[in-house]
Curated annotation (Swiss-Prot):
Activated by cAAA and to a lesser extent cAA; cAAA binding promotes hexamerization which is probably necessary for nuclease activation. This is CRISPR-associated endodeoxyribonuclease NucC. CRISPR (clustered regularly interspaced short palindromic repeat) is an adaptive immune system that provides protection against mobile genetic elements (viruses, transposable elements and conjugative plasmids). CRISPR clusters contain spacers, sequences complementary to antecedent mobile elements, and target invading nucleic acids. CRISPR clusters are transcribed and processed into CRISPR RNA (crRNA). The gene is nucC. Encoded in a type III-B CRISPR locus. Mg(2+) binds at residues 74, 105. The record marks 54, 82, 226 as: Binds cAAA. Keywords: Antiviral defense, Endonuclease, Hydrolase, Magnesium, Metal-binding, Nuclease, Nucleotide-binding. It comes from the Bacteria. Its cofactor is Mg(2+).
Length: 245
């Protein structure tokens, strides 16, 4: 016998669950660092539960083959299927730049200060060097895959910029700017994303903002395709030379 379920109810429950967890974190933890960690964990858990298995979400630093590091990123969505290595050092996760699909700053509220902070974090990742090797196949090799555009965003519980035009004014930015935000969500009010078809930022107020945001993120990840084939030797050159016998 078919279950008496409704898709609308399932999607509503997903949004309500995330908003409830974020609200609980905000009310339960007074220490700002603990509160921040709790909110990050809510978003990381959401992504790891609902994104396809090829993706993994974690708090991390990002590194490139030229020994440059990003700032610490609250949520990094990266490729775990084709990534040849992920570093774990002193309880920190360090991910090669080639493996990154998206990076997010997590805050309690959506406002200009936090938008600027998110831009700075996103730019620190996009500025890193990424390699891309030719891809072997049965008939020869494919040309190196074009580098994907790393998605950058901001995730919050509340929106302090309730007037859409005000929020739009703070979000609008040159696409060439490495700190431009492609997407974001204020769980209690809205989500936003850059609409490539119309070449403009869209702010969408929504009762199920978290679920709507997740669907838009999935769409953007699909358009990214697969990360490039990483040049292992570019990283290996940083190995300390062996002492000659």
């Amino acid at each position: 016998m078919a279950q008496d379920w409704q898709l609308s109810e399932l999607l509503e429950n997903l949004h309500a669950d995330v908003q409830h967890k974020l609200t609980t974190v905000r009310k339960s933890f007074k220490h700002s660092v603990v509160k921040g960690d709790g909110a990050e964990n809510v978003w990381v858990d959401l992504f790891n539960q609902y994104l396809p298995e090829r993706y993994r979400a974690s708090r991390a630093f990002v590194v490139d083959s030229e020994n440059q590091f990003s700032e610490q990123i609250d949520v990094v969505i990266y490729d775990r299927q084709y990534s040849p290595f992920i570093f774990h050092y002193a309880e920190q996760l360090i991910i090669p730049a080639e493996s990154v699909y998206a990076v997010f700053e997590v805050k309690q509220t959506l406002n200009k200060q936090h938008i600027d902070a998110a831009r700075k974090k996103v730019a620190s990742v996009r500025a890193l060097h990424r390699t891309s090797l030719p891809i072997p196949h049965a008939g020869g090799v494919h040309s190196p895959r074009e580098l994907i555009g790393i998605i950058g965003g901001l995730l919050t519980l509340e929106n302090e910029l309730k007037i859409p035009d005000t929020l739009m004014g703070h979000l609008d930015h040159d696409k060439a700017d490495k700190g431009m935000l492609n997407i974001g969500c204020a769980a209690d009010d809205c989500f936003f994303y850059y609409d490539n078809d119309h070449q403009r930022m869209q702010v969408m107020q929504h009762k199920k903002a978290t679920t709507a945001f997740l669907f838009e993120l999935l769409s953007q990840l699909q358009k990214c395709g697969t990360v490039p084939m990483i040049d292992i030797h570019a990283y290996g050159k940083w190995l300390t030379p062996r002492i000659s016998e």
